[in-house]
């Protein structure tokens, strides 16, 4: 029977495949076990009756998992009370101990490990005997014995695991002191709780801020409304038109906004003259809007001369000067560009 028990332990420790069901690295666990305890090689001195070697065994244990393959375990075992009865003597033997072992495991699947435990047990063995019709005697002994165990462990959840284990303890007692020196095999089922197995909640990166949206607003004012022909001084009607424009610009209130005033002329006159006139008209508009409240560092003037005419070739065949001036009126204009970053409102995440 002893050889069979050792063979079972070795076989259980010898299985191997590829996944991991051990607790997470550097975590603790605790559990309890219950099972069948069997004493072997009892050899009671002077016993002439039956010995009840099969008893109930139990224990509690705690451990520390270093990595998926190595852990250390400490536990208490109650190996059971073994009575014996005879014609000449009656009595009982009981043993218990504290063990410390290294636990070596190997994964079979994601949820199943095989393992072996190797270490020692500090035990205490007690006996009580009496001769029918005579006095009873008690004695005890303590010592250290090697412990070998093998088993399989199944993770029901990341925190809870169950195990099936066979444990062998050699030579528990001193025959000269308590009358026997048995070995013990304990086949048990255990349940353990593993601490610290919960995965940390993933950190959700905040949604990136939306890219700023740049918006541009265009306004076009007729130069004939703002200025007299061939002049750069604002007319009263022109000031009224700019007052209305300023109100619209104030309502826009663009973030980090800027205003560019572009002056245009018609093609009548030289290029140089028209360029200068367009710059003066644009600057007149800028100066007026600054006087109304637009910051001077947010507004600029640019003369465009006779470039970008909107009339195209519509007036090519118009010869009388007065008629040509009227025909080219759309080219004489002031354009205003307002650029700014539009605020993007994002909804809070639930």
UniProtKB/Swiss-Prot annotation:
GO terms for biological process: monoatomic ion transmembrane transport. Disulfide bonds join 315-327. The keyword RNA-binding does not apply. It is found in: Cell outer membrane. The chain crosses the membrane at residues 27-37, 55-66, 70-78, 96-107, 112-120, 146-155, 160-167, 186-194. Residues 205-212 are annotated as: 4 X 2 AA tandem repeats of A-P. GO terms for cellular component: cell outer membrane; pore complex. Sequence repeats lie at residues 205-206, 207-208, 209-210, 211-212. It holds the Pfam family OmpA_membrane. GO terms for molecular function: porin activity. It is a multi-pass membrane protein. Residues 1-21 form the signal peptide. With TolR probably plays a role in maintaining the position of the peptidoglycan cell wall in the periplasm. Acts as a porin with low permeability that allows slow penetration of small solutes; an internal gate slows down solute passage. Monomer and homodimer. Belongs to the outer membrane OOP (TC 1.B.6) superfamily. OmpA family. This is Outer membrane protein A. The gene is ompA.
């Amino acid at each position: 029977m002893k050889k069979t028990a050792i063979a079972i332990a070795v076989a259980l420790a010898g299985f191997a495949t590829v996944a991991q069901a051990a607790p997470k690295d550097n975590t603790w666990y605790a559990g309890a076990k219950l099972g069948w305890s069997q004493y072997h090689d009892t050899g009671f001195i002077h016993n002439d009756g039956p010995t009840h070697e099969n008893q109930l065994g139990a224990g509690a244990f705690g451990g520390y998992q270093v990595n998926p393959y190595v852990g250390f375990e400490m536990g208490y075992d109650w190996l059971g009370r073994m009575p014996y009865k005879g014609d000449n003597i009656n009595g009982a033997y009981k043993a218990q101990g504290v063990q410390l072992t290294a636990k070596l495991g190997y994964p079979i699947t994601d949820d199943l490990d095989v393992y072996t435990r190797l270490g020692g047990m500090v035990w205490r063995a007690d006996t009580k005997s009496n001769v029918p019709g005579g006095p009873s005697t008690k004695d005890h002994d303590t010592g250290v014995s090697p412990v070998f165990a093998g088993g399989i462990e199944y993770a029901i959840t990341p925190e809870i695991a169950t195990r099936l284990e066979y444990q062998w303890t050699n030579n528990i007692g001193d025959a000269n002191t308590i009358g026997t020196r048995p070995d013990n095999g304990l086949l048990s089922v255990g349940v353990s709780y593993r601490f610290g197995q919960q995965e940390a909640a993933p950190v959700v990166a905040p949604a990136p801020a939306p890219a700023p949206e740049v918006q541009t607003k265009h306004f076009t004012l007729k130069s004939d409304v703002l200025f007299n022909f061939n002049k750069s001084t604002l007319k009263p009607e022109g000031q009224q038109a700019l007052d209305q424009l300023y109100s619209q610009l104030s309502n826009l209130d663009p973030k980090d906004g800027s205003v560019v005033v572009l002056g245009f002329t018609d093609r009548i006159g030289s290029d140089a003259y028209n360029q200068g006139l367009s710059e003066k008209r644009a600057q007149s508009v800028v100066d007026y809007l600054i006087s109304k409240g637009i910051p001077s560092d947010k507004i600029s003037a640019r003369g465009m001369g006779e470039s970008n005419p909107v009339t195209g070739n519509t007036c090519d065949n118009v010869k009388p000067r007065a008629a040509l001036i009227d025909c080219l009126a759309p080219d004489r204009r002031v354009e205003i560009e307002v650029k700014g970053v539009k605020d993007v409102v994002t909804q809070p995440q639930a």
